[in-house]
């Protein structure tokens, strides 16, 4: 049984992007001394432009539901999921806004999550985005994937109570980006935080430099004017 023991052992837990010891360099202080987070990174014009352009481009692409038959595949506009994906995934969002939101999450955090809402018969009736920075991917005692979501200041109307909630794989639409285990993606912002930190530092230095020049010129102009007034007063009889 020794040769086959490796085939039947349980899979390792997913390498969670946010609390894994091997990924302690997630959002945080860069070598430039600047703290790089999802919010500060988006204030950098290059990061914001990339996220905006890619998110809007993906959100504009056509999204249809197909089924396979003996001739290949055909579009199925009457399928129940067609309306959710193509038109309105939930009463608060259009398909464009929903896909734009998920794509921006994927670009910033490396993962995009959406809660799958079902009716009593098990039919999917809604999709709501979940914030990736509040999600932890793990395995339960039966080695099943679980999603532990922290409900603090939550905007999702389906998660009203505060605290942690456990969602199973059939309750979450998870789109991971590039990662080492194929389950959890790594944040592009975190991986490039030193480059972004340098850009933020340069922007702040430039703004401070030009701000000091303006103040210096104002001070020089003030003293020039004040000095000329004093001179004219002293020369008066």
Language model regions located:
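Structured, contiguous alpha/beta core segments that scaffold functional sites
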Residues: 1-237
């Amino acid at each position: 049984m020794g040769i086959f023991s490796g085939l039947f052992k349980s899979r390792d837990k997913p390498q969670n992007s946010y609390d894994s010891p091997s990924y302690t360099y997630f959002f945080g202080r860069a070598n430039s001394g600047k703290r790089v987070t999802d919010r500060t990174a988006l204030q950098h014009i290059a990061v914001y432009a990339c996220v905006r352009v890619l998110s809007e481009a993906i959100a504009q692409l056509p999204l249809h539901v197909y089924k396979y038959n003996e001739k290949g595949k055909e579009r199925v506009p009457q399928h129940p999921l067609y309306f959710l994906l193509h038109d309105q995934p939930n009463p608060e969002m259009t398909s464009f806004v929903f896909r734009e939101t998920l794509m921006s999450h994927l670009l910033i955090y490396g993962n995009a999550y959406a809660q799958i809402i079902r009716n009593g018969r098990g039919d999917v009736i809604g999709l709501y985005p979940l914030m990736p920075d509040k999600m932890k991917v793990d395995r339960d005692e039966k080695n099943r994937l679980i999603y532990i979501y922290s409900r603090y200041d939550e905007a999702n109307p389906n998660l009203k109570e505060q605290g942690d909630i456990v969602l199973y794989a059939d309750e979450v639409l998870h789109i991971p980006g590039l990662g080492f285990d194929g389950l959890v993606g790594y944040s592009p912002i975190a991986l490039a935080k030193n480059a972004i930190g340098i850009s933020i530092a340069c922007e702040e230095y430039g703004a401070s430099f030009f701000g000091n020049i303006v103040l210096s010129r104002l001070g020089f102009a003030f003293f020039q004017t004040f000095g000329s007034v004093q001179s004219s007063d002293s020369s008066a009889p």
